[in-house]
Amino acid sequence: MGLKMSCLKGFQMCVSSSSSSHDEAPVLNDKHLDVPDIIITPPTPTGMMLPRDLGSTVWLDETGSCPDDGEIDPEA
């Protein structure tokens, strides 16, 4: 799933023509950057759950401790 160079050049022209403030990073023309495969996401605000986290959620009781504190997790 690669992008054609013509698409990238059009995107760079749009970005460079719209950047008028000095706070924005300059557009790097004809440079290939080594970007790692790891994507770091900010923490989710309290009270919001992502669908992938619903199955592995451990709910705390009113004392703030896990209901299974005394047991060893067999999957660990």
Swiss-Prot record:
InterPro entries: DUF4597. Residues 36-41 are annotated as: Required for interaction with PPP3CA. Disulfide bonds: none annotated. Changing residue 44 to A: Abolished phosphorylation and interaction with PPP3CA. Changing residue 41 to A: No effect on phosphorylation. Keywords: Phosphoprotein. The modification Phosphothreonine is found at residues 44, 46. Interacts (via PxIxIT motif, when phosphorylated on Thr-44) with PPP3CA. May act as a prognostic marker of median survival time in pancreatic cancer patients. This is Uncharacterized protein C16orf74. It comes from Homo sapiens (Human).
